[in-house]
Amino acid sequence: MGEAPAFFVDHLENGYTNGFGVKSEPKNRDTSVLIGDRSFVIGGNHEGNPLFLGVQIHDKVTNKWSSPSVLGTGPKPCKGYSAIVLPKGRILVIKKGSASDDSIWFLEVDTPFIREQKKLLGREVVAWSKGVRGNAEKPIVISGPSGVGKGTLISMLMKEFPSMFGFSVSHTTRAPRCMEKNGVHYHFTDKTVMEKEIKDGKFLEFASVHGNLYGTSIESVEVVTDSGKRCILDIDVQGARSVKASSLDAIFIFVCPPSMKELEDRLRARGTETEEQIQKRLRNADAEIKAGKSSGIFEHKLYNDNLEECYKTLKNLLGINDLAPVNGVEVEGINLPKEHTVTKMDDKILIQETGEGTKNKMIVLDLSSINGGAPGRTRGIVLDTVKSS
């Protein structure tokens, strides 16, 4: 218990020696925090790009500067920042004079994700994670062999609860087909770009199909969640295995046919495939069913021998069987004052408005229940405004 001061007040007015006998003079909007023997300097722009906030590291022992690989999409530069060191290798960064939906960010410098990325990249790494108020419902991963009816079940959910569920838009490196729209059917991207983003840990799952990459990015899931909807991922067992190993906390459901004979009858009833294609799908389905039942990935297994009963069971699993369709509820924004001081008290951050004409407003951030993190969002923030004495 007790009060601890924030570590944001160092604006580097005297600069640092850059290791070559020349002082580096950060701009007066830069903010630094000290963790051990290293100062993390936040400000300016990233690699000359004025749209993204820069990060530099100064090692007090070697007196050298370094520019780390910065993962994730960070905050845009603004008129000033406050920063405070948090436990578990994170720095809370608050943008001054910004609305609450764009003011709270976390810079991860020594989390499990960062340590993993350092091993993969072989260099210094930091990562941004946007802070989001409140929690969100877990995304839903639904897998099953072709012809089992999982697409129909998902369509029924989307039709009955259009404001509750949403699809993530996958990425692919193949060329768009006729009538396909970028950002609607797929995010069409360059192979080199997608390979780099996969290496940077931005994808939950990916696969190479006929020489083209397909995958689900973390951002595409977060965008659905940010809109107030619960994200549904319709992916195969291989993709579900990758999602299970990621930082995403999801519900995993596998849809099984009542029998292989029933599945074969359904595939033949489509009348859209040759005998060779049907036999290939059956072989793939048999392998996928065995993997789905024995992999330990899926907490729930549904047997679709009756569509209406299976749909009712699915809704029960998701806790929505007796719910009426509802619209998403928007969280009211709170503007953070341009001039303020920051104090840390246990898991709470107290932001006190300062300057002339202030209204003695104090904003309290409760971080006791935060979850998630880079390369996705950090959720669970509780934010409130109180009158200070």
UniProtKB/Swiss-Prot annotation:
Residues 137-319 form the Guanylate kinase-like domain. One of its GO terms (molecular function) is guanylate kinase activity. It is an enzyme of class 2 (transferase). The keyword Nucleus does not apply. The keyword GTP-binding does not apply. ATP binds at residues 144-151, 304-305. Monomer. NCBIfam families: guanyl_kin (TIGR03263). This is Guanylate kinase 2. It comes from Arabidopsis thaliana.
